[in-house]
């Protein structure tokens, strides 16, 4: 028995020794980009022996792999690069050093995107319609902001600064974008309004833009109702890089002389709202409106740090009156790559951005013959300053196929509405309306008797309690005083009255008397002592935290899951109130790759949302039971029919929560009011599509054809209604008669907009 034990132990030792020497051979080295010589982090080195065996490169691009004695076929692969096949013959206990240089793939469908699934994958494998724009494509267009480039994409449009995909946006000016806009995966939408200010996008430091068309709320939440636009910024390489550009443009005269709103002396007289730096020197000889811009960016690596920064200065006098824009943007990134992590990858850092911005909002034209002049009801511009700091940490463990990502944000914004112009004076308005020079001179001299008939016309009807007679009386009187008045002129007059107010003693008209304070009121408005061009400053604060976990298996399966929390505080100086909102969401997505041809994806999201004490903003019915959160789903597949031929199908749900401005805010914007409506419900919808993509190459010319058929349905879309509103309860006034009755009762009303579901 003892002899048997010795033989058994000896056999085990021999086997263990043989097993150890079988994989005692080592291949090591670095993996580089063949063009830039930069190390490729996370590149895979694999071979087949009883299944796939392999390792990945570390933060320095280094790899080390144990190989069996004899010959193997090694494959070096990296997303977005061409595979390198390396036959290798290695002797017992050999240690071989071999550096590998990989070429970036020049095939369009091999390009890498992250937006479709929150992880890197080939463009050809995504299950949704997606466009990709590289930095070189943007540079060739030399845009002043990214909207000029986005307009060139099929199915994408920018209507009054709002993004629209496949016609999916209604017309909610200044609030509630229905497409989510991201910079490096972080939303750039204003927390309180839900709108996009394109000046926040760092045009000077873009690597690529990824555009997904169709509902994408499962991974990106509210506002991804139409899709998403993800701007990915460039990161430093081994070689320091500095980029500077300067540009200038000149607007031509309007083709129709009636449309011309400026003349050749505007710049000298200081009538433009903003002044470009070169206007008073190099460009002083140009008489037409101009724009200019300067971009500067620099990036480099210092030890284990990635450092980048950029500055942008842009000034645009505007081809439309009140269409000006002036911005100064400064931002940067600092990333630290933790050394001595072996094959694991750990990096952390922060992004910082600051923007100060002045711009005009051209909302409604004054008249069909004055299309470049704004309506007096929309005499508004904005001054805005915002700052955000975004810390992050990323950890990747290729050994077990897991990754953890944490992103945060602190955001602060201060903005106010300004009046770019003081508006027409009462004498100018009367002159345009055809009032004779003597009447205007009398009014300017303090004789207001010519205006009495209009007020008496109202009173004659009110004495008898007949509002229709009152209106007929006033229109008859006004027709005599203003023989040449157009609708636009009356709008000027109404806007002027809204700005300067009315006599306080209007109730005396019902007794057939003129207001006792008519003369002091007229004297004050003819010689105004105030010119407050700004409203009070509103402030908003945003706190955001996002955690994402990803797990990959060798069989081609992977999951992406995580949670998001966002808190918004909005201090409204106009309402003298503070609004607070909280948003909590959890998401899960499963992706599987079969036979290296079929990609399948499915995901779900649940989101809770509240504003102040409105705790059930996301309330939904599930099987007849109300729950305080909203679930959404998506699914898709992509199948490779042949080389560079792909067919895809997908279906997804989307939603958009009304912004604080849409639902809760009362605000005056250039004479026009925004009125709250607590009955607004969230928008929701879904998108289903079937698509086919075919790549081609003819000589050095390559591209692809992408055809998609889709069906989109939306419910409870939010649109605004324009009209007269009761300033007390915010209800809409249905007739002029009701408005006059309110005035006679000493109650105020306003002109403005209110949002409703349609």
Residue ranges of each PLM-predicted region?
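Structural signature of Gram-negative outer-membrane beta-barrels, strongest in the C-terminal barrel
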Residues: 552-568, 572-713
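Extracytoplasmic beta-strand/coil segments of soluble accessory domains associated
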Residues: 147-186, 190
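Short acidic/polar hinge/loop motifs at secondary-structure boundaries
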Residues: 64-66, 186-213, 234
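Short, acidic, small-residue-rich periplasmic hinge/interaction motif at the N-terminus
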Residues: 32-36, 43-48, 77-82, 91-139
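Outer membrane beta-barrel strand-and-loop segments of large Gram-negative receptors
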Residues: 526-548, 677-681, 687, 698-758
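Flexible loop and strand-edge segments within Gram-negative outer membrane beta-barrel domains
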Residues: 316-331, 335-396, 410-430, 532-541, ...
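Short, acidic Ser/Thr/Gly-rich low-complexity loop/linker segments typical of extracellular
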Residues: 50-62
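Outer-membrane beta-barrel translocator/receptor signature
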Residues: 190-192, 205-207, 218-229, 235-330, ...
């Amino acid at each position: 028995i003892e002899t048997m034990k010795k033989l058994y132990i000896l056999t085990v030792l021999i086997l263990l020794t043989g097993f150890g020497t079988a994989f005692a051979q080592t291949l090591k080295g670095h993996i580089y980009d063949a063009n830039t010589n930069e190390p490729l982090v996370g590149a895979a080195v694999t071979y087949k022996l009883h299944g796939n065996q392999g390792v990945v490169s570390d933060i320095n691009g280094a790899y080390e792999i144990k190989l069996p004695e004899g010959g193997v076929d090694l494959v070096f692969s990296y997303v977005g690069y061409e595979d390198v096949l390396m036959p290798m013959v290695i002797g017992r206990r050999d240690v071989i050093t071999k550096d590998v240089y990989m070429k970036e793939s020049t095939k369009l469908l091999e390009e890498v995107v992250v937006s479709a699934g929150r992880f890197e994958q080939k463009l050809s494998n995504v299950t949704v319609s997606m466009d990709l724009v590289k930095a070189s494509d943007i540079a060739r267009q030399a845009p002043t902001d990214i909207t000029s480039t986005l307009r060139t994409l099929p199915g994408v449009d920018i209507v009054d600064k709002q993004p629209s995909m496949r016609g999916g946006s209604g017309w909610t000016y200044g609030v509630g974008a229905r497409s989510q806009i991201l910079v490096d995966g972080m939303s750039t939408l204003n927390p309180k309004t839900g709108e996009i200010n394109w000046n926040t996008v760092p045009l000077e430091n873009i690597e690529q833009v990824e555009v997904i068309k169709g509902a994408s709320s499962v991974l990106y939440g509210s506002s991804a109702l139409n899709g998403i636009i993800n701007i990915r910024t460039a990161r430093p390489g081994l070689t320091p890089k500095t980029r500077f550009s300067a540009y200038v443009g000149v607007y031509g005269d309007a083709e129709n002389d009636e449309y011309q709103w400026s003349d050749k002396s505007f710049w000298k007289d200081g009538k433009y709202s903003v002044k470009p730096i070169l206007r008073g020197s190099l460009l002083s000889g140009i008489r037409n409106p101009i724009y200019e811009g300067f971009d500067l960016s620099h990036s480099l690596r210092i030890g284990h740090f990635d450092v980048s920064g950029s500055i942008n200065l842009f000034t645009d006098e505007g081809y439309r009156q009140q269409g000006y824009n002036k911005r100064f943007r400064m931002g940067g990134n600092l990333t630290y790559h933790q050394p001595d992590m072996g094959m694991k990858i750990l990096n952390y850092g922060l992004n910082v951005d600051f923007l100060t911005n002045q711009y005009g909002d051209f909302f409604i034209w004054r008249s069909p013959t004055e299309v470049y002049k704004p309506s007096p009801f929309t005499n508004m511009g904005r001054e805005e300053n915002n700052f955000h700091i975004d810390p992050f940490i990323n950890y990747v463990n290729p050994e077990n196929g897991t990754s953890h990502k944490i992103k945060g944000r602190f955001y602060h914004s201060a903005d106010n509405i300004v009046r770019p112009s003081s508006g027409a004076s009462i004498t100018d308005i009367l002159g345009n309306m055809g009032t004779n020079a003597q009447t205007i001179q009398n009014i300017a001299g303090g004789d207001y008797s010519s205006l009495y008939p209009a007020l008496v016309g109202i009173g004659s009807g009110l004495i008898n309690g007949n509002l229709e007679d009152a209106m007929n009386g006033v229109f008859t009187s006004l027709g005599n005083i203003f023989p040449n008045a157009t609708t636009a002129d009356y709008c000027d007059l109404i806007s002027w009255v809204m700005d300067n107010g009315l006599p306080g003693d209007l109730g005396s008209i019902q007794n057939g008397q003129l207001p006792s304070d008519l003369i002091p009121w007229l004297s004050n408005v003819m010689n105004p002592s105030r010119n407050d061009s700004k409203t009070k400053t509103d402030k908003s604060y945003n706190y955001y935290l996002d955690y994402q976990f990803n797990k990959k298996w060798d069989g081609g399966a992977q999951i992406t899951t995580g949670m998001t929390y966002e808190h918004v505080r909005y201090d409204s100086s106009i309402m003298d109130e503070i609004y607070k909102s909280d948003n909590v969401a959890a998401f899960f997505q499963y992706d599987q790759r079969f036979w290296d041809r079929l990609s399948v994806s499915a995901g779900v999201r649940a989101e809770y949302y509240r504003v102040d004490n409105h705790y059930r903003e996301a309330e939904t019915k599930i099987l007849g039971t109300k729950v305080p959160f909203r679930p959404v789903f998506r699914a898709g597949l992509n199948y490779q029919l042949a080389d560079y031929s792909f067919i895809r199908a997908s279906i997804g749900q989307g939603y958009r929560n009304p912004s604080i401005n849409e639902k809760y805010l009362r605000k005056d914007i250039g004479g026009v009011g925004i009125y709250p409506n607590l009955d607004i419900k969230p928008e929701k919808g879904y998108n289903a599509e079937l698509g086919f993509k075919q790549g081609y190459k003819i000589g050095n010319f390559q591209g692809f054809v992408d055809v998609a058929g889709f069906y989109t349905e939306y419910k409870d879309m939010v649109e605004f209604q324009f009209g007269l509103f009761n300033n007390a309860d915010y209800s809409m006034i249905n007739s002029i008669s009701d408005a006059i009755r309110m005035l006679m009762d000493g109650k105020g009303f306003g002109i403005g907009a209110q949002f409703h579901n349609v």
